[in-house]
Curated annotation (Swiss-Prot):
Its main location: membrane. This is Endo-type membrane-bound lytic murein transglycosylase A. A lipid is attached at C16 (N-palmitoyl cysteine). It comes from Escherichia coli O1:K1 / APEC. One of its GO terms (cellular component) is cell outer membrane. The gene is emtA. It catalyses: Endolytic cleavage of the (1->4)-beta-glycosidic linkage between N-acetylmuramic acid (MurNAc) and N-acetylglucosamine (GlcNAc) residues in peptidoglycan with concomitant formation of a 1,6-anhydrobond in the MurNAc residue. Murein-degrading enzyme. May play a role in recycling of muropeptides during cell elongation and/or cell division. Preferentially cleaves at a distance of more than two disaccharide units from the ends of the glycan chain. It is a lipid-anchor.
Length: 203
């Protein structure tokens, strides 16, 4: 894995030196992952309920909040999985058949936050990202969409969802990462994939 990442970075930096270096500054996943692992029993329960890998949930917790259930971002993303009440929170409420959106206190509750984060990952996988065949590519697409929206990702391939999914299915995981690094409008999108791999390796 480390050799593959090193080779990929050499190619990327040589061929696209003007692009943002998404591995700089380096991110040490050890402490955030250790803190996120304390919530693994809840992540396993939520993962089983929504068909989501608990390790993916744990990695997102490490990246998003460093395992802090009271974390609040400048954009008002809240809790362990940094859920925005008015967007992903509202989407989860709709999936559950509820009206409105989650409260701040609800999103600071570890069990509720992780459950909603897992539910949102399921919404992405079974909705806009449905049809992606390669499990690793799907994992990368999930975290990029979780952080920056599925629409922004799909539009880098095509304005038509079916065509976008078809183009994604022509790529392996490294090619998908290269596409995101070169074409996604958000510089943090490829960095999120980099952090995901760092977090998974630290578990």
């Amino acid at each position: 894995m480390k050799l593959r990442w090193f080779a990929f970075l050499i190619v990327l930096l040589a061929g696209c030196s003007s692009k943002h270096d998404y591995t700089n500054p380096p991110w040490n996943a050890k402490v955030p992952v250790q803190r996120a692992m304390q919530w693994m029993p809840i992540s396993q329960k939520a993962g089983a309920a929504w068909g989501v890998d608990p390790q993916l949930i744990t990695a997102i917790i490490a990246i998003e909040s460093g395992g802090n259930p009271n974390a609040v971002s400048k954009s008002n993303a809240i809790g362990l999985m940094q859920i925005k009440a008015s967007t992903s929170g509202r989407d989860v409420y709709r999936r559950m058949g509820w009206s409105g959106e989650p409260t701040t206190s609800e999103l600071k509750n570890p069990e509720r936050n992780i459950s909603m984060g897992a539910a949102y990952l399921n919404i992405l996988e079974t909705g806009p990202l449905a049809g992606i065949e390669d499990p690793k590519v799907l994992q990368y697409a999930l975290v990029v969409s979780y952080a920056n929206g599925a629409g922004a990702l799909l539009r880098t391939f095509s304005s038509d969802r079916k065509k976008a999914i078809s183009k994604i299915n022509d790529l392996d995981a490294d090619e998908f990462l290269d596409h995101v690094a070169r074409n996604h409008p958000a510089p943090q999108a490829p960095r999120y994939i980099y952090k995901l791999e760092q977090a998974l390796d630290a578990m």
